[in-house]
From Swiss-Prot:
Zn(2+) binds at residues 132, 135, 152, 155. Pathway: Purine metabolism; AMP biosynthesis via salvage pathway; AMP from ADP: step 1/1. It holds the Pfam family ADK_lid. It catalyses: AMP + ATP = 2 ADP. Monomer. GO terms for cellular component: cytoplasm. GO terms for molecular function: adenylate kinase activity; ATP binding; zinc ion binding. AMP binds at residues 35, 40, 61-63, 91-94, 98, 162, 173. This is Adenylate kinase. Residues 34-63 are annotated as: NMP. It is found in: Cytoplasm. Consists of three domains, a large central CORE domain and two small peripheral domains, NMPbind and LID, which undergo movements during catalysis. The LID domain closes over the site of phosphoryl transfer upon ATP binding. Assembling and dissambling the active center during each catalytic cycle provides an effective means to prevent ATP hydrolysis. Some bacteria have evolved a zinc-coordinating structure that stabilizes the LID domain.
Length: 215
């Protein structure tokens, strides 16, 4: 499959990776491909793949690499018209197995790793996070509060904090992320396609840095 402008955004939970990816997609016209959006789209289809995926998702189970790979590639091959100008991957690949599958199908042009030097800053961000259970919009009590307290700006549903957003759980998730992403970072570094972006920079500055490398 011939496709230009293939980019990946990496970052720990709560670092702002999704926000940056969406902003860059909006300014460049590239398609924003998040794992969650792909899963939700495929689950709405009729067929064995959607049923198998729903079995894991509806029970909150970990989706195996093989199924994740199959779901990702199914989405890509059935949305070629939307993706022909290029896309931004957000949340995939997460493991070496997923990376090996991806690179057997296509080659990434650039990888951006959004990184926070101080993990306590990230902990504070996540502890202040509010999520809309209806449309998935994400807010922050300090840096991105909703217009009306505890109400989603888009669909007006009541915002919620995640039950597992505690400092101990967050630090555990960060450690797990670092262990999981380390071999990916090493692989992308060897390939010469990794760019590290400091997550404490203002969003506009992050976008400008990315746009210098995204054509």
């Amino acid at each position: 499959m011939v496709m230009e402008n293939k980019f990946l955004f990496l970052g720990a939970p709560g670092v702002g990776k999704g926000t940056l990816a969406k902003q860059v997609a909006n300014t460049t016209g590239l398609f924003h491909l998040s794992t969650g959006d792909i899963f939700r789209s495929v689950m709405q289809e009729q067929g064995a793949l959607s049923q198998t995926l729903a079995h894991y998702m509806n029970q909150g189970l970990y989706v195996p690499d093989e199924l994740t790979n199959q779901t990702f590639w199914h989405f890509v091959t059935t949305h070629q018209n939307e993706l022909h100008k290029g896309f931004i991957l957000d949340g995939y690949p997460r493991t070496l197995n997923q990376l090996e599958f991806l690179q057997s199908k296509l080659q990434l042009d650039q990888v951006f790793h959004l990184k926070l030097s101080d993990p306590q800053v990230l902990v504070a961000r996540i502890l202040n996070r509010l999520v809309c259970p209806s449309c998935g919009s994400v807010y922050n009590k300090q840096s991105k509060p909703p217009l009306k307290a505890n109400q989603c700006d888009r669909c007006h549903a009541t915002l919620q904090a995640r039950n597992d957003d505690t400092e101990a759980v967050i630090l555990k998730r960060l450690t797990l992320y670092e262990d999981t992403v380390k071999p990916l970072i090493e692989a992308f570094t060897k390939q010469g396609i990794l760019t590290v972006i400091e997550a404490q920079l203002p969003l506009e500055q992050q976008v400008n840095l990315v746009q210098q490398l995204v054509h």
